[in-house]
């Protein structure tokens, strides 16, 4: 009750502040960014430069005949808000002047087209037609780019996933992360981004990524995308729930004519080069097919659009069926009894020894080639209905199905059992938008969306239940991945309700609104339920797991070393043997983790089960003020709150109950909800030339990221009461916290009886009592200059400073900084804290040419430096600090730091009906900590071998027949020069990797894609 009262009081304060701002700004209120629509504004003057008030302006969409009227004010200005993207004809009329017609004025999502118009006196009826729009936008203050229909349609994309177009825009990079590719804006974490589809939230609130994430080959059919806007920095107060970038995706609509398409794209092994290490893509083929159709339900009133796309793909990897390294093993069946030294020195002998051992002892074949089949299809339907002159309704439905077997891991040294089945995942999204014109100066947009994502994940069939990692280089893996043991059932659904109101008065455009997102996640996460073993070497594993008759010391063994690091012998733990005096255990089992053991306490959910909800609230008010004909000011305030779930059981019943009164214990057992997220945003655009050819833009704002639910769940379930875990490690002298026993017999689990209550040494997870959501302070300055008609250059500088970044710190670790645990009665204590920081500086130089004279292009170069003390996106299982009590030692260049980046894109009509599109992408390597191990000063002090360069291109020739039909064959080539483009997302030793999705090795080789498309 008290919590609800506090939330109500906070909301009341925000409403009062918003109302106060409203009163201040109602010298009532030039055009602002629209999430799903665009704006056309302009100034009408006569031949002498005098303003022409009361001039009538009619705007008509060429494809649907949707129309809007406006009239100029005393200063000759007009604004038409909330225009659906498309091409418009403007007709400007005034008594005594020749009618002025502007053709092909293109409105894109989020754009504000500013037209300087001049009318000439005429005593007779006369029409003057022009066909030109400004090259430089002199009213926008943010650093944003709109990828129009031509860019979406013509750019060669290897997988036809719309997210791969984002790197065409400056300030956006794709970096290799532990859960797949991450989209980073101005150096920020990928989980900070906000993706919207047709105005509705298109994010998975649990994983902190777009729906479908990296698992789905596609989540929206590219054929349905009309255009999208990318706001890298400087977003206005209307945009929330982001400390990174904003991506607005707008889908196509039907028109007065019936139009459609059918297409088929094909890649295959015969048209693919060997990878840079000389290996073919075995049995590779990819078929991508689909089509669209759209047209009128009723002319000028209602329209329909449908799109479908399917994918069928397979790829066979050799994995452990092929030799490892350059030297084959000289012994066909190496064993530790006869060949221990040979196994230690030869990676291929390790492969044979391990796979033969597992086949013999577990009847599990680990050395077969691995198929990676993909089955994916996406469908979108949309209806647009002009209800009357004042109301326009748009409803869209997006569905995606994805099932990808053996797509969890793509690592050459992983066995057949170390993989998972991603799916079948199903995404359902419904978006409803109602656009209402109350008067020529007042418009409203009401929105509701519902999304539901079912994302099951399971292991492949295996007789090895435990996730088993063996060795450092090479690093092998067998058994159920720890996060899929044996499966994860995850269902997320959310609703998004918002309303925005815009009001034009004089030289102000005032806008305010609010939104509410309700998210519910229902899952059973069986992480570490069947255990995870990490062994230092192949022979160490074989010694540990083999009985003495086979040359081992099993069922569990100690590897002893003296103080100088010299090996002193093996000891069998099952016999109660310990290391000799002066020696200590150093292996072979470096770490064992187990979770999901029930305490038997009544009134708590079963292990792994969690139903959690989040509520996100937002209010904003903003004004765009045309202070002078050459200066536009944008300013606003946004407030947000994220209401986190309450504890499953009272904190006084948890394993850490006795510590709640201890001032050194970092948590009170609850998740504190951030409710005071006030975010001022300001910006200006200054037309320096006073001719619309040179503009200086600048913006500053505070932006809050939201906390994904994956980071929340552990603190709800891992409380020692619902479930507890055990940890066995070298630092515990190979006893196990959470159980009074020695490490288990591989591949079994620690035999702890459920129902025994909370044990001594149970591991827990908590939220810090002073937790706050990540906060980013961003400043951007940009200069853009028109060199010639349709041709501009631009220079951009961005500075972003991050505070309160999420870090996962295990405060009960021991090491050189602590000889004994801080709280000896507990095992690991992972704290979700807000102590991280970051700093990004980036400079961009670019050129841009709009389509004219049969070609367009854009190129940009980015020089940047990105620093932080923890680049962890959402991995709650890993403490990446060197010393949890001195986090300043971790501050260095970020995992995402790409010092140099270059992008170029062009579309050219080559002649004879042939069209060409060319794309170049290049970036330098990401940093990594030396393989020798982390020290106090060497975090990310070296560079990986994952620098990237790719030259992609497409040639196509439409063959037209009839009035509106065309058949277009296409020839595409990707990675033309067959660059290695190595994939290395690891941030440390592969043995200790806890990624939920991992691909390593060489990148995609040169590939040819053949396609044909029929349009009508």
Residue spans for each PLM region:
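Periplasm-facing N-terminal accessory domains of Gram-negative outer-membrane beta-barrel systems
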Residues: 3, 9, 13-148, 223
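Periplasmic N-terminal accessory/gating domains of Gram-negative outer-membrane beta-barrel systems
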Residues: 97-120, 124-253, 268-274, 286, ...
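Solvent-exposed loop/turn elements at secondary-structure boundaries
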Residues: 175, 459, 600-601, 647-679, ...
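Outer-membrane beta-barrel channels and translocator barrels
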Residues: 190, 252-254, 298-300, 388-390, ...
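Outer-membrane beta-barrel translocator/receptor signature
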Residues: 209-210, 223-230, 237-246, 252-343, ...
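C-terminal beta-signal and adjacent terminal beta-strands/loops
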Residues: 790, 912-934, 945-950, 956-1016
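Gram-negative outer-membrane beta-barrel transporters
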Residues: 794-927
């Amino acid at each position: 009750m008290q919590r609800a009262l506090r939330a109500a009081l906070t909301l009341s304060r925000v409403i009062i502040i918003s109302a106060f701002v409203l009163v201040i700004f109602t010298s009532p209120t030039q055009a602002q960014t629209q999430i799903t629509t665009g704006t056309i504004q302009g100034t009408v003057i006569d031949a002498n430069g005098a303003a022409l008030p009361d001039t009538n302006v009619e705007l008509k969409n060429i494809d649907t005949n949707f129309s809007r009227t406006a009239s100029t004010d005393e200063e000759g200005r007009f604004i038409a808000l909330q225009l659906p993207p498309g091409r418009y004809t403007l007709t400007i009329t005034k008594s005594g002047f020749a009618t002025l017609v502007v053709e092909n004025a293109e409105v894109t999502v989020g754009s504000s087209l500013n037209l300087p118009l001049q009318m000439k006196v005429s005593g007779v009826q006369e029409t003057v037609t022009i066909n030109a729009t400004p090259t430089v936008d002199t009213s926008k203050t943010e650093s944003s780019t709109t990828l129009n229909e031509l860019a979406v349609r013509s750019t060669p994309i290897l997988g036809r996933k719309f997210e791969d177009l984002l790197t065409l825009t400056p300030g956006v990079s794709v970096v290799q992360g532990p859960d797949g590719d991450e989209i980073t804006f101005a150096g920020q974490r990928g989980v900070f981004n906000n993706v919207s589809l047709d105005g509705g939230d298109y994010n998975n609130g649990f994983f902190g990524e777009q729906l479908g994430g990296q698992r789905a080959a596609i989540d929206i059919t590219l054929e349905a995308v009309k255009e999208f806007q990318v706001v890298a920095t400087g977003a206005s107060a209307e945009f929330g729930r982001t400390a990174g970038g904003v991506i607005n995706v707008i889908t196509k609509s039907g028109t007065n004519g019936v139009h459609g398409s059918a297409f088929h794209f094909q890649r295959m092994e015969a048209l693919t080069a060997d990878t840079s290490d000389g290996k073919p893509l075995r049995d590779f083929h990819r078929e991508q097919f689909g089509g669209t159709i759209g047209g009128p339900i009723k002319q000028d009133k209602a329209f329909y659009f449908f799109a479908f796309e399917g994918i069928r793909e397979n790829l066979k990897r050799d994995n452990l069926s092929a030799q490892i390294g350059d030297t084959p093993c000289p012994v066909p069946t190496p064993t530790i009894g006869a060949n221990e030294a040979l196994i230690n020195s030869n990676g291929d002998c390790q492969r044979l020894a391990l796979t033969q051992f597992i086949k013999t002892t577990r009847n599990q074949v680990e050395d077969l080639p691995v198929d990676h089949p993909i089955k994916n299809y996406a469908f979108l339907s949309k209806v647009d209905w002009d209800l009357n002159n004042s109301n326009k309704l748009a409803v869209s439905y997006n569905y995606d199905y994805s099932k990808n077997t053996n797509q969890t891991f793509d690592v050459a040294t992983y066995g057949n059992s170390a993989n998972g089945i991603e799916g079948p995942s199903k995404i359902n999204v419904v978006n409803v938008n109602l656009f209402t014109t109350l008067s020529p100066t007042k418009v409203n947009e009401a929105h509701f969306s519902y999304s539901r994502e079912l994302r099951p994940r399971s292991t492949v069939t295996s007789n090895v239940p435990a996730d088993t990692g063996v060795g450092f280089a090479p690093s092998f893996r067998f058994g159920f991945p720890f996060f899929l043991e044996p499966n994860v059932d995850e269902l997320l659904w959310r609703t998004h309700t918002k309303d925005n109101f815009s009001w034009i008065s004089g030289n102000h455009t005032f806008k305010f609104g609010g939104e509410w997102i309700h998210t519910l996640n229902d899952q059973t996460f069986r992480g570490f339920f069947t255990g995870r073993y990490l062994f230092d070497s192949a022979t160490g594993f074989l010694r540990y797991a083999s009985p003495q008759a086979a040359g081992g010391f099993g069922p569990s063994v100690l590897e002893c070393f003296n103080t100088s690091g010299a090996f002193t012998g093996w000891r069998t733990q099952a016999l109660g043997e310990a290391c000799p005096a002066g020696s200590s255990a150093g292996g072979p089992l470096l770490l064992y983790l187990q979770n999901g053991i029930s305490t038997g306490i009544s009134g708590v959910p079963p292990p792994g089960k969690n139903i959690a909800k989040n509520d996100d609230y937002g209010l904003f008010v903003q004004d765009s003020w045309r202070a002078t004909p050459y200066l536009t000011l944008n300013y606003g305030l946004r407030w947000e709150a994220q209401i986190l779930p309450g504890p499953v059981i009272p904190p006084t019943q948890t394993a850490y109950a006795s510590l709640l009164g201890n001032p050194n214990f970092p948590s009170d057992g609850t998740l504190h909800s951030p409710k005071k997220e006030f975010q001022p945003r300001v910006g200006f655009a200054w037309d320096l030339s006073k001719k619309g050819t040179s503009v200086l833009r600048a913006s500053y704002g505070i932006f809050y990221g939201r906390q994904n639910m994956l980071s929340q769940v552990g603190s709800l379930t891992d409380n020692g009461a619902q479930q507890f875990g055990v940890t066995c490690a070298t630092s515990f002298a190979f006893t196990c916290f959470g159980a009074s026993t020695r490490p288990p017999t591989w591949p079994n689990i620690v035999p702890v009886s459920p129902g025994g209550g909370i044990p001594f040494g149970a591991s827990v997870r908590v939220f810090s009592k002073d937790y706050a959501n990540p906060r980013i302070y961003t400043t951007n300055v940009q200069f853009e200059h028109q060199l010639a008609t349709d041709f501009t250059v631009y220079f951009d500088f961005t500075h972003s400073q991050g505070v309160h970044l999420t870090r996962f710190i295990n405060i009960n670790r021991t090491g050189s900084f602590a000889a004994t645990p801080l709280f000896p009665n507990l095992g690991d204590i992972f704290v979700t804290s807000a102590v991280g920081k970051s700093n990004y500086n980036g400079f961009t130089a670019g050129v841009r040419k709009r389509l004219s004279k049969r070609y367009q292009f854009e190129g940009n170069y980015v020089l940047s430096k990105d620093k932080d003390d923890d680049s962890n996106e959402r991995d709650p299982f890993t403490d990446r600090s060197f010393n949890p009590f001195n986090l300043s030692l971790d501050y260095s260049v970020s995992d995402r730091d790409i010092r140099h980046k270059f992008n170029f894109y062009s579309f050219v009509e080559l002649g004879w009906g042939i069209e060409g599109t060319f794309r170049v992408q290049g970036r330098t390597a990401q940093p990594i900590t030396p393989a020798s191990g982390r020290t106090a000063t060497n975090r990310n002090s070296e560079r990986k071998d994952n620098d990237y360069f790719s030259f992609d291109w497409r040639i196509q020739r439409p063959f037209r027949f009839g009035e509106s039909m065309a058949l277009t064959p296409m020839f595409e080539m990707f990675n033309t020069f067959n660059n290695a483009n190595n994939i290395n997302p690891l941030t440390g030793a592969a043995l200790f990797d806890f990624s939920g999705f991992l691909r390593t090795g060489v990148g995609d080789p040169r590939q040819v894609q053949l396609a044909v498309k029929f349009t009508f």
